[in-house]
Amino acid sequence: MLLPMKESKRKRYCQGLFAFLVIAITLSGLLRTAFWPKDVNTYESRNANKPEAFTVGNYLSGVFQDSMEKALADQVPFAQYFKKVFNILRFQYYRFMLLPKAEQHPELCFHYKGIGLIDGYMVHKPADLSENIEIMLSLAHKRADDMRACREINPETEYYLFYIESDRDYDFETAEKKDTYGFITENMEIPADRTGRLCVDNLEDYKKIYFKTDHHWNCYGAYEGYRGLMTLLGVEEKLLEPVETASDPLWWAGSKAAEVGFREYKEPFPICRYEYPPMEIFINGSPSDMLEPQEAFFSGEMDSISYGDYYGGIEGEVILDTNRPERKNILLLGDSFDNAIRKLVASHFNKTFSVDERTYEEDRGEPFILAEYVRKNDIDIVVYDGDILAFSGDAFL
């Protein structure tokens, strides 16, 4: 009789200890969420979710409850660790069940959680222009109005559009292509000889330009984009060429892999070295030497990498000054695709201004008004560039 009693007592003790740990972790998560929320979700490389302010309006509309649920998923201790373990196990299952089929039939597109996998490349579903028609029209008309207002103050300034096609423009299963470029150029009212694009007309085009697991272009795609943009702008001097390409690149997993929880699906991160002219770089007004740390990479000082780590994150304003006043000043108005070509473009100009309208006001403390910015900085050339997200996101309005 004594043995069963001891086992029963031990069982109750273990149950009580487990319940205590669960309650302790939950309470610590609630306290952390309410009073000391962390700013960054390091596992997913994004800003951590935080709860909205508790107000009657937020509570009745459900905004507070939804934000609290998302915040707890980020703030509770060990949440990222458990998510990582879960994603690793899920990836192993995915690799065991689906990847062999994908490898046997590279011409087919296999779908998982909104992402397609074709010949080893993760691809998004092509954009449905009808779903974003109002935002795209509003943004195109706003930019057309901005250029008209700018011409009244700065009649000498030239305006260009350079569009970067992606998997959101081309359906690899049906070989159908969206005419996003035509829609944008028509509604922004930029003359045809001032517009250009980097085309994706088939899977082979896409594979040359983009990462397997990320929505950004790789260094080869960025270089082709740079060449295309310089041709559009009529730059006649010799373009920069890579002097070295990484023979032993670091491996990483990009945004698409993170989107479906497959951080273990890694690929090489190719890097090209260029001989840039001397330039001073300012990020949101502060001097910086963190864009494209070529020496650190090629000397082996970097042990991990991502698109943002190497080319820079989302910044409201980046200025690259080569101190050659006899040359023109250029303004790039785009998104994070610009990050990989800023220094290449800057090599041909006096000052290169790169503005991301999504975060400019927050980072610089004032709204972005094109006419005033062009006048203040003596801009000669304005380029609207990017993929479809730069022309369909309400954050740019």
Task: Describe the predicted segments one by one.
Residues M1-L397:
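Extracellular glycan-modifying ectodomains
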